[in-house]
Curated annotation (Swiss-Prot):
MF GO annotations: hormone activity; peptidase inhibitor activity; toxin activity
A GO CC annotation given for this chain: extracellular region
Tissue: Venom gland.
Source lineage: Eukaryota, Metazoa, Chordata, Craniata, Vertebrata
Protein known as: Bradykinin potentiating and C-type natriuretic peptides
Length: 201
């Protein structure tokens, strides 16, 4: 009895789906549905021939090639005077006139004077430029001496050592230190590593 009720309700649903709200079948209702209005063929052709902006053919178009551009119209932008200076070489950047035949009575010396002047200017410029770097270096002679004193305090404390006078005790200690450093750990000879290098022997 329950199954028959289920079957009856299913059939009723199918019948309701087949009939539309007006009471007409679904196929007839879909045929009468107003679709999008398609304009006639004459109107379509007229819309395709709508006046567009006239584009001249490629032969008529007169574009400037990159070689025809003036120096001030460079496509990359920026200053072209700098590029011209760089292309001419370092002599153009220094603004020194080239030595010609009308130099004067002492042609060779007068021509060499500006070059010598520019070289001295360049040398002083490089020395002033490298001075801060020289000051920042930590491996100077004095720094190395300080490190040597810190690592080998007994080496520099000998009396009478030094350059020309005295008994040369520092040299003796230097030789002993070399021998002491030469006798290595575990029977191996150490070449440049000192006894205070932290090998633990």
């Amino acid at each position: 009895m329950f199954v028959s009720r289920l079957a009856a309700s299913g059939l009723l649903l199918l019948a309701l789906l087949a009939v539309s709200l007006d009471g007409k079948p679904v196929q007839q209702w879909s045929q009468n549905w107003p679709g999008p209005k398609v304009p006639p063929l004459v109107v379509q052709q007229w819309s395709q021939n709508w006046p567009h902006p006239q584009i001249p053919p490629l032969v008529v178009q007169n574009w400037k090639s990159p070689t025809q551009l003036q120096p001030r119209e460079s496509p990359a932008g920026g200053t072209t005077a700098l590029r011209e200076e760089l292309s001419l070489g370092p002599d153009a950047a220094l603004d020194t006139p080239p030595a010609g035949p009308d130099v004067g009575p002492r042609g060779s010396k007068a021509a060499a004077a500006p070059q010598r002047l520019s070289k001295s200017k360049g040398a002083s410029a490089t020395s002033t430029a490298s001075r801060p770097m020289r000051d920042l270096r930590t491996d100077g002679k004095q720094a190395r001496q300080n490190w040597g004193r810190m690592l080998n305090p007994d080496h520099h404390s000998a009396p009478g050592g030094g350059g020309g006078g005295g008994g040369g005790g520092a040299r003796r200690l230097k030789g002993l230190a070399k021998k002491r450093a030469g006798s290595g750990c575990f029977g191996l000879k150490l070449d440049r590593i000192g006894s205070m290098s932290g090998l633990g022997c």
